[in-house]
From Swiss-Prot:
The keyword Transmembrane helix applies. Disulfide bonds join 39-71, 56-103. Heterodimer of CALCRL and RAMP3; interaction induces allosteric modulation of CALCRL function and ligand specificity for adrenomedullin/ADM and intermedin/ADM2. Heterodimer of CALCR and RAMP3; interaction form the receptor complex AMYR3 for amylin/IAPP. Interacts with GPER1. The keyword Repeat does not apply. It comes from the Eukaryota. The lineage of its organism: Eukaryota, Metazoa, Chordata, Craniata, Vertebrata. GO terms for biological process: adenylate cyclase-activating G protein-coupled receptor signaling pathway; adrenomedullin receptor signaling pathway; amylin receptor 3 signaling pathway; calcium ion transport; cellular response to estradiol stimulus; G protein-coupled receptor signaling pathway; G protein-coupled receptor signaling pathway involved in heart process; intracellular protein transport. It comes from Mus musculus (Mouse). This is Receptor activity-modifying protein 3. Residues 23-112 are extracellular.
Amino acid sequence: MKTPAQRLHLLPLLLLLCGECAQVCGCNETGMLERLPRCGKAFADMMQKVAVWKWCNLSEFIVYYESFTNCTEMETNIMGCYWPNPLAQSFITGIHRQFFSNCTVDRTHWEDPPDEVLIPLIAVPVVLTVAMAGLVVWRSKHTDRLL
């Protein structure tokens, strides 16, 4: 019987073969969709440790979310699928809706000022720029008269 140290040299070969199997066998979407809810359940169980009013504060559960992300990536790869993919993203979006639907950020809604204010704010600098350029050109043509 081989010791773990003796089997260690087989690890790269095993990883290579597993990677090739995923590419040859293709993506088992059905299997992936059966396995992803395990990640969601584990995440839900971990989120029960966090008070609901803290669910919008990422620093309160970032470790749990990282674990959830790693789980979805691993389960997706085991089934020979790339991560992320549309089905996995749809599942993750569903988890987001379940836990973070009330986490909207109130942002200031900016509006343009009324036209009575906006037009002068645009027109005055344009007119001044044209006037100053014209003054420079006119002055450069008439410099010999001043000297």
